[in-house]
Each structure stands twice: as C-alpha cells, then as structure tokens.
C-alpha cells in the first residue's frame, strides 16, 4: 500500500484555497500497539494524529509541533508530537472508565487544547484554546480562526481497514493572500463533505482528488512520508537517572533492587541495576543494546 502514511499538499489553480490530504494508518497502528485504550480514546488519538500531521505541513522551519488535549474528565491527557519530517509519536493517560462512543466533552470534561511549536532556532510559540466544540475538528477550526484568522475546514476519519487501525483526513484553508475569499472555501468544503473514510483509507491521493474535484484544476505536489518515531533510548534514560539526587537513586535501588524505566510512547523498557548505576557514576557510557555489564 504505497499511498499509505503520506502527506500530500495540493493547490487549486483558480481558487484561493490550499489543501492537504494525509493517510497515517500504519503510524496510527504503531501508536496504539502497546496500549489497550478504550475505543473512544483510540478514535480520538487517531484524529489527533491526523490533525498534528496536517499541522506539520504548516511548519516553515526545522522543529517540533505538539498538539495536546487536557481536561478534568476521565481522559486526563491525549498528546501527539511531530516534527517537520512528519515523524510522529503519541500517548493518552486515563483515570476512570470511558464508554464506547463517548464525546469529546464526556472524555475531557472542562478541557483545553494546547498547540506548541518549537523551532530548533528561535522562540517557542504556544497557543491555547478552550475545548468548546463538539468535535476535535471544530476545536481546531476555532484555533485557526483565533490564531491565524484563516478560515479552515478539517475532515478526519478513524476506523479499521483490513482488520488494522486506519486514520486519514483532509484540510482546506483559505490562502493568507486572500483571507476574505470565503466563497471558494465554502464551495470546496461542500464537495469535500462527500469523501468517505473508505476512499481516504484505500485510494491514492490523486484518485481521491479527482473524485472530489474533477471540475477543478488541481496541482498535486510530491508526497512526504510519515513515520512513527520515538526518541527514547537507553542513553537518554541513563541521563535522566543521573539527574536525580544520589539519595533518591539509593532509595530506589534499595527498595526495588533495580530501576525499570518504561517509555509510554513505544513500550520499551530500560533496566538499570546497581552495577549499571555505579558504572554510570564512574563515567561509563550505556550500551544501547543492553546493560552496562
């Protein structure tokens, strides 16, 4: 399925609107792989992945973007982190039961969406918007109006295809050079509402665009690959341990005999016993393939 896990950008030759189409199904499956989330949380994480991937296309520099949902409901946190290379990871944290079909409001309660853009060079930007919409799409559209004053429409779908998790979506946005030209967006949004999850999950981008916009002149650009990437490593885990006060390390070792660091994103475990800790204190470098001894 070569068209999967790709981000496509496109422009309309005669309309002041830009578009994006993404299928991130394999990446979505990888994010869910080591977790047993309720169905409603799985679906929300898929939408959040699609949304964050679409947002990475707006980055005009090397850097990261994080879209985070947090609230006082049973779903305390849902977050997706991506970068300009469309390398993605994500996780959710729950306290309490979440029924199938639960709405955004039921899951998060009184919540906010925090979008953080961190360039490798320059200042970090953070935007916060209350989760007042019925869907994640509604909340993101409100964010674009609030932060960039650009009317935007999002179409996001999650589900299964051939027994595997599937996540895909589309974005339409008025070009910044013509922010008041809402008629073009309204026209194209009406056409785009006819797209089905099955089409986005299974068809190449050019075929989807032809089915939707065959009366329009569309320029489709080269796709960008999307992939799951977790930045954890034994070395980073060792550095985190060495940042703890020595007394706290001793207490952990005395209590447990060893320290097991678990990565919520990818499910990896990094085990450090007393020999490892003593070697790290002596300046040894952790072996990425295993323990120090």
From Swiss-Prot:
Disulfide links within the chain: 230-232, 263-266
CC per GO annotation: cytoplasm
TM regions (residue ranges): none
Post-translational modification: Under oxidizing conditions two disulfide bonds are formed involving the reactive cysteines. Under reducing conditions zinc is bound to the reactive cysteines and the protein is inactive.
Zinc as UniProt keyword: yes
UniProt record, GO biological process: protein refolding
Keyword field: Chaperone, Cytoplasm, Disulfide bond, Redox-active center, Zinc
SUPFAM superfamilies: Hsp33 domain, HSP33 redox switch-like
GO molecular function terms listed in the Swiss-Prot or TrEMBL record: protein folding chaperone; unfolded protein binding
Pfam family, one: HSP33
Coiled coil: none
InterPro entries named among the record's database cross-references: Heat_shock_Hsp33, Heat_shock_Hsp33_C, Heat_shock_Hsp33_N, Hsp33_helix_hairpin_bin_dom_sf
Record localization: Cytoplasm
Entry keyword Chaperone: yes
Family: Belongs to the HSP33 family.
Function: Redox regulated molecular chaperone. Protects both thermally unfolding and oxidatively damaged proteins from irreversible aggregation. Plays an important role in the bacterial defense system toward oxidative stress.
Name of the protein described by the UniProt record: 33 kDa chaperonin
Organism placement in taxonomy: Bacteria, Pseudomonadati, Pseudomonadota, Gammaproteobacteria, Enterobacterales
